[in-house]
Amino acid sequence: MLKVEDIKKAVSKFGKQYGIKNAYLFGSYAKGVANEKSDVDIIIEKGNLQTYKAYSGLLYSLEDELGTSVDLLTMDGVKPRFFELIKNDRILLYGA
């Protein structure tokens, strides 16, 4: 099973390459309740990541690096209510 530090390293590796501004971990890994079947939930502020091709490239790069499924969301792609539900449990992976 992955550690938060492993996820942070993977996101940092690709963050600059894909031009993301900030990335946060949420869900089971952020809450410390992940198991072998858990995917990795990440929400990003896109920064320079503006095309679907770039988004897909980042997603596939993270999945390859981590060896597991990644649920990659963007801040502007989720409703404010959803963000309110996750903001207290999120962990900064990359950015400010």
Model regions and ranges:
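Short hydrophobic/aromatic beta-strand micro-patches
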Residues: I43-E45
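Conserved H-loop
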Residues: S28
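Conserved histidines in hydrophobic membrane contexts and catalytic metal-binding motifs
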Residues: L25
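Catalytic core of pol beta-like nucleotidyltransferases
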Residues: M1-N22, K31-E36, G47-A96
